[in-house]
Regions:
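Soluble N-terminal domains of membrane-associated systems
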Residues: 1-128, 135
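Conserved small/polar residues in nucleotide/adenosyl-binding loops
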Residues: 152-154
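Hydrophobic transmembrane alpha-helix segments characteristic of membrane transport
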Residues: 145-149
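Short, charged, surface-exposed secondary-structure boundary motifs
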Residues: 136-144
Length: 154
């Protein structure tokens, strides 16, 4: 039996500031609700995509796991004052999730370098088996058109 925790980290707490959701968020339903609230509050927020990526990994692990395996998903939130304060919040929330779920391994789903700064915090408490960086794809044609239009209006 292997217990895997899928983690999404919001180090600067956009989830709390923009959507009014406090971390930790634990469980598939609560995580999906949080992602929707953040996506509605700010459709351009990249943390929404990272959270959806965590849900994707959670669901794929459930599909592939044995019936004796456990899989859970959680969002850890930091603080708008990124640094020691946000890292302490993430550590405290991770300790709570570990106490409740007792994972053997973790999968970290992130949207970039800022959230990846939490890797030492997470790896000091649970083994990270995989790190997935979610990067939103955009149409090159749209990007080029926007760039050229911005040059015209300088």
């Amino acid at each position: 039996m292997v217990r895997t925790l899928v983690i999404s980290v919001d180090r600067d707490n956009d989830l709390g500031v923009k959507a009014g959701v406090r971390g930790p968020v634990i469980g598939r339903k609560a995580t999906l609700t949080a992602a929707l609230r953040l996506g509605i509050a700010d459709p351009e927020e990249s943390d929404t995509n990272a959270i959806m990526g965590a849900l994707h990994h959670h669901d794929r692990l459930i599909e592939k796991s044995d019936s004796s395996d456990g899989v859970e998903v959680a969002i850890l939130t930091g603080d708008v004052r990124v640094g020691p304060r946000s890292d302490r919040a993430i550590a405290s929330q991770l300790d709570e999730v570990i106490r409740l779920f007792q994972p053997d391994t973790a999968v970290l789903v992130t949207d970039g370098a800022e959230d990846e700064a939490s890797i030492p915090i997470i790896s000091s408490r649970v083994r990270i088996d995989h790190i997935e960086k979610i990067i939103v794809r955009q149409s090159k044609g749209i990007e080029s058109t926007y760039y050229y239009l911005s040059l015209i209006h300088i």
